[in-house]
Swiss-Prot record:
It is found in: Secreted. The keyword Transmembrane helix does not apply. The lineage of its organism: Eukaryota, Metazoa, Spiralia, Lophotrochozoa, Mollusca. Disulfide bonds join 3-9, 4-17. Alpha-conotoxins act on postsynaptic membranes, they bind to the nicotinic acetylcholine receptors (nAChR) and thus inhibit them. This peptide is active on neuronal nAChRs alpha-7/CHRNA7 (IC(50) of 3.24 uM), alpha-3-beta-4/CHRNA3-CHRNB4, alpha-4-beta-2/CHRNA4-CHRNB2, and alpha-4-beta-4/CHRNA4-CHRNB4. 10 uM of this peptide inhibits these receptors by 85%, 40%, 19%, and 13%, respectively. GO terms for cellular component: extracellular region; host cell postsynaptic membrane. It comes from Conasprella longurionis. Its main location: secreted. Keywords: Acetylcholine receptor inhibiting toxin, Disulfide bond, Ion channel impairing toxin, Neurotoxin, Postsynaptic neurotoxin, Secreted, Toxin. This is Alpha-conotoxin Lo1a. Belongs to the conotoxin A superfamily. InterPro entries: Conotoxin_a-typ, Conotoxin_a-typ_CS. The keyword Mitochondrion does not apply. The cysteine framework is I (CC-C-C).
Length: 18
């Protein structure tokens, strides 16, 4: 949800989905 489902944000913050 949020940054986790946003490809650009996920690229910059890969640990957010961890």
């Amino acid at each position: 949800e949020g940054c986790c489902s946003n490809p650009a944000c996920r690229t910059n913050h890969p640990e957010v989905c961890d």
